[in-house]
Amino acid sequence: MKTLQSTLLLLLFVPLIKPAPPTQQDSRIIYDYGTDNFEESIFSQDYEDKYLDGKNIKEKETVIIPNEKSLQLQKDEAITPLPPKKENDEMPTCLLCVCLSGSVYCEEVDIDAVPPLPKESAYLYARFNKIKKLTAKDFADIPNLRRLDFTGNLIEDIEDGTFSKLSLLEELSLAENQLLKLPVLPPKLTLFNAKYNKIKSRGIKANAFKKLNNLTFLYLDHNALESVPLNLPESLRVIHLQFNNIASITDDTFCKANDTSYIRDRIEEIRLEGNPIVLGKHPNSFICLKRLPIGSYF
């Protein structure tokens, strides 16, 4: 009888026992997984924290706070384009310029003075800068220069003797500057360009070109000349004098009034347009030329 009662009680209670829902089973599994890896995850996090802390400490240790003196030094170095030119600097360094086998290129770098040049320099191109003055010291130790180009600067003063030691100089361009007068030119020039300046006739000495027996190309257009320069050498082939204030010429300007047989056969081009002169009023001034000047004849 007792056995039967126990069996009945068992049958009554079995339906009341239900398995845990799936979500609870999953949470138990996840919890078990987390428990199994808890120690490993804690170690990993602790290692990363120590690594980052160490890295931060290292970075903090290597930070150098500059003082006011060092900051000023850095500022001075940053704004100084060229070092001071030394008297005995035998091989100066081209800083803002490019130096290639005797040629120095300093174009559009905003320099306001001629930079130090290597002694072997033969060609200097310093166009479109802010140079205001040329001095004798600029080229005193550069005897092999053959070409100088200062087109497009602000040059208004050229010191006496600036080109006196440049016995090999063949081409000189001072175009597009602020010149009021011409300097003494070196004797071997073949090309001289001083167009687009403010040069008046009184700024050119009477014998400025007389001894330049190799001068072939002369460009003085777009200035303020009142007359054609005197004593132009026989070597000239091209003379540009257009857009000045030239109002008259004489029979001796290009020819020789006392020698009707004289022929100036080397001149190929004379430009006088843009001047107030009427060329047709001076027919004897061109009698020695093979080609008439370009300009107004009426």
UniProtKB/Swiss-Prot annotation:
InterPro entries attached to this UniProt entry: Leu-rich_rpt (IPR001611), Leu-rich_rpt_typical-subtyp (IPR003591), LRR_dom_sf (IPR032675), Mimecan/Epiphycan/Opticin (IPR043547)
Signal is among the record's keywords: yes
Name used for this protein in its record: Mimecan
UniProt GO cellular component terms: extracellular matrix; extracellular space
LRR repeat coordinates: 112-131, 132-155, 156-179, 180-199, 200-225, 226-246, 247-277
A biological process term (GO) from this entry: bone development
Carbohydrate-modified residues: N88, N214, N258
Biological source species: Pongo abelii
Keywords carried by this UniProt record: Disulfide bond, Extracellular matrix, Glycoprotein, Growth factor, Leucine-rich repeat, Proteoglycan, Repeat, Secreted, Signal
Span of the signal peptide: 1-20
